[in-house]
From Swiss-Prot:
This is Glutamate dehydrogenase 2, mitochondrial. It is an enzyme of class 1 (oxidoreductase). Belongs to the Glu/Leu/Phe/Val dehydrogenases family. Important for recycling the chief excitatory neurotransmitter, glutamate, during neurotransmission.
Length: 558
C-alpha cells in the first residue's frame, strides 16, 4: 500500500508542464513566493506547484569550484530558513540584534574550520623513494568527533576535501548523526602500488594525522571512501592502537569500516548502497510525488541505470534488483554496457571479479553513448562529483536522479532538472547510509559489546514462552491438551521471533533513519513551497539542526 503525502489530487507528469505558465497564478492563490511557509490548507498545491529556482547559487558555469558549489547550496537553504531562525530565537534582543546573531552563526557554520596538508616519503619495493601528498579537512566541530572518509585518488585536492567535509557536516545533520564533517584524501592511484607499499602509505598517513591531532575516537574518526576499504581501515586502527592510542581502551573506535575481527560491524560494507535503496524507496512509494512524475508507486517494472560499479553502485543495484526494478545499463571509467532486458548484479559482479572489468560481459552489449543519457526511470550517479552538468542535463531522460555519489550535480544542472520536473534525491540525504552505520560501529566500539549479544537469547526465549502460553490457553478453553492445538508461526515470523542479530538491528535502524529523514525532507519541502527541490529542503533541515547546536551551546570568546 502506497502513501499519499498530500490530500489534494496532484497532476500527472504531463500535466505539470502547464504549471510553469500558471506559476504566478498559483503563487497568487497561495499569497506567497517560493521559500515562504506554505498555507496549511493547501498541502497538495504546495507540493505540486513548481516555483522559480533561486539565483543564490552564484556559479552559473559548467564546471564550478566544488567547495563554492556546496557553499552555494548552503546559501540557498540559509536564505529560506533565516526568517524562521530569527523568529525562533528566545532572547531579550531587538529584531535587528536577533537577525545579526542568526547571520553571524550562519557565517560560522559555512567555512571549513581546519585543513591539514601533508607530505611524507615512502621507500618503494624497488628501492626508489617517493613523496606522498595527502590532506585532511575538518569542516565543523559543532559535534565531535569529526567524521568522514579517506579516499585514494590522483584527483584529490584541497578544494575536493573541503567540499566533501562540508557535505559530511550537512549529511550527518540530515540523518541526526551527532558528528561534525571531515574528509581526507591521499593523492595516489592505488593500482600503481603493491599491497606492501599501500600499507606503508596508510600507516604513515595515520601517524601524520595522529601527530597533528587529526585522528582519535573523540576527535576525528575516518572511514572508507573511494579506493579504500576494510583492509586500509584495519591498518589505520592497528597503527593508532599500537602507538598514540596504546593506553586508550577505546582506541579501535578511531576509525570505522573495519573488518569484524577488528571491531567492525555487520552491514557496514553494504550500508551506503542499502541507504541509497531505502532513500529511493521512501520517495518512489510516495504516491503524491510519483503522480507529479507520471509514474506508478513502487519498484516493480521500473528501469534504472548505474554510473559507477564500485561499492555504492554495486549494492544499490543489488537491492533495487531484488525489489523488482530492472538495471538496463552500467557505466564504469573504462566503458559502459547495456541490455534492455536487464543485467543481473550477481553475474556482473562475478564477471568483474574474474576479468577486472565489466567490459566484455556476455549478457550485455557495449554502450558507446553517455551512460547518463540512457532512457530509464531512475538514474543513479554513483561515481564522482560534477558528472551532471549544464551541457548534458537537457539530454538526461530519467525521471528520478538518485545521487549515490557526493556532489554529482552542478548548480546549473540542478536548475535544469527543476525546470524539467525531474526529481533529484540529493546526496546529503541519499548516501548517508554509510555514515549512519559508521555511527553504529563507533557506538559498538565504545560500548565494547556487539548489538544483540546481551538480549538475543532472552528475547528468543520470551517469544517462545509467549507462543506456548497462547497455545495452552487455547487448549484449556476448548478442553484439549497435549499439543492438539499447535501454534505454528510463519517462516517470516519464525525468523523475527528467533531474536535479532547484529545485522538485523543494523538494517532495521538504517531503514528507520532513512525513513524518518525522508519524512522530514518532505515536510520541509511542503512547508516552504519548494516543490520537487528536495536538495534545498535537506539543506534547510541540516542548517536548522547545526544552528540549534551553536545557538544553545553559545559561541566561546566572542
Amino acid at each position: 500500500m502506497y502513501r499519499y503525502l498530500a490530500k489534494a489530487l496532484l497532476p500527472s507528469r504531463a500535466g505539470t508542464a502547464a504549471l510553469g505558465s500558471a506559476a504566478n497564478h498559483s503563487a497568487a492563490l497561495l499569497g506567497r513566493s517560493r521559500g515562504q511557509p506554505a498555507a496549511a490548507s493547501q498541502p497538495g498545491l504546495a507540493l505540486a506547484a513548481r516555483r522559480h529556482y533561486s539565483e543564490l547559487v552564484a556559479d552559473r558555469e559548467d564546471d564550478p569550484n566544488f567547495f563554492k558549489m556546496v557553499e552555494g547550496f548552503f546559501d540557498r537553504g540559509a536564505s529560506i530558513v533565516e526568517d524562521k531562525l530569527v523568529k525562533d530565537l528566545r532572547t531579550q534582543e531587538s529584531e535587528e540584534q536577533k537577525r545579526n546573531r542568526v547571520r553571524g552563526i550562519l557565517r560560522i557554520i559555512k567555512p571549513c574550520n581546519h585543513v591539514l596538508s601533508l607530505c611524507f616519503p615512502i621507500r618503494r619495493d624497488d628501492g626508489s623513494w617517493e613523496v606522498i601528498e595527502g590532506y585532511r579537512a575538518q569542516h565543523s566541530q559543532h559535534r565531535t568527533p569529526c567524521k568522514g572518509g579517506i579516499r585514494y585518488s590522483t584527483d584529490v585536492s584541497v578544494d575536493e576535501v573541503k567540499a566533501l567535509a562540508s557535505l559530511m557536516t550537512y549529511k550527518c545533520a540530515v540523518v541526526d548523526v551527532p558528528f561534525g564533517g571531515a574528509k581526507a584524501g591521499v593523492k595516489i592511484n592505488p593500482k600503481n602500488y603493491t599491497e606492501n607499499e599501500l600499507e606503508k602509505i596508510t600507516r604513515r598517513f595515520t601517524m601524520e594525522l595522529a601527530k597533528k591531532g587529526f585522528i582519535g575516537p573523540g576527535v576525528d574518526v575516518p572511514a572508507p571512501d573511494m579506493n579504500t576499504g576494510e583492509r586500509e581501515m584495519s591498518w589505520i586502527a592497528d597503527t593508532y592502537a599500537s602507538t598514540i592510542g596504546h593506553y586508550d581502551i577505546n582506541a579501535h573506535a578511531c576509525v570505522t569500516g573495519k573488518p569484524i575481527s577488528q571491531g567492525g560491524i555487520h552491514g557496514r560494507i553494504s550500508a551506503t548502497g542499502r541507504g541509497v535503496f531505502h532513500g529511493i524507496e521512501n520517495f518512489i512509494n510516495e504516491a503524491s510525488y510519483m503522480s507529479i512524475l507520471g509514474m506508478t508507486p513502487g519498484f516493480r517494472d521500473k528501469t534504472f541505470v548505474v554510473q559507477g560499479f564500485g561499492n555504492v553502485g554495486l549494492h544499490s543495484m543489488r537491492y533495487l534488483h531484488r525489489f523488482g526494478a530492472k538495471c538496463i545499463a552500467v557505466g564504469e571509467s573504462d566503458g559502459s554496457i547495456w541490455n534492455p532486458d536487464g543485467i543481473d548484479p550477481k553475474e556482473l559482479e562475478d564477471f568483474r571479479l574474474q576479468h577486472g572489468s565489466i567490459l566484455g560481459f556476455p549478457k550485455a552489449k557495449p554502450y558507446e553513448g553517455s551512460i547518463l543519457e540512457v532512457d530509464c526511470d531512475i538514474l543513479i550517479p554513483a561515481a564522482t562529483e560534477k558528472q551532471l552538468t549544464k551541457s548534458n542535463a537537457p539530454r538526461v531522460k530519467a525521471k528520478i536522479i538518485a545521487e549515490g555519489a557526493n556532489g554529482p550535480t552542478t548548480p546549473e544542472a540542478d536548475r535544469i532538472f527543476q525546470e524539467r520536473n525531474i526529481l533529484v534525491i540529493p546526496d546529503l540525504y541519499l548516501n548517508a547510509g554509510g555514515v549512519t552505520v559508521s555511527y553504529f560501529e563507533w557506538l559498538k566500539n565504545l560500548n565494547h559489546v556487539s548489538y544483540g549479544r546481551l538480549t538475543f537469547k532472552y528475547e528468543r526465549d520470551s517469544n517462545y514462552h509467549l507462543l506456548m502460553s497462547v497455545q495452552e490457553s487455547l487448549e484449556r478453553k476448548f478442553g484439549k491438551h497435549g499439543g492438539t492445538i499447535p501454534i505454528v508461526p510463519t517462516a517470516d515470523f519464525q525468523d523475527s521471533i528467533s531474536g535479532a542479530s547484529e545485522k538485523d538491528i543494523v538494517h532495521s535502524a538504517l531503514a528507520y533513519t532513512m525513513e524518518r529523514s525522508a519524512r522530514q525532507i518532505m515536510h520541509t519541502a511542503m512547508k516552504y513551497n519548494l516543490g520537487l527541490d528536495l536538495r534545498t529542503a535537506a539543506y534547510v533541515n541540516a542548517i536548522e539542526k547545526v544552528f540549534k547546536v551553536y545557538s544553545e551551546a553559545g559561541v566561546t570568546f566572542t
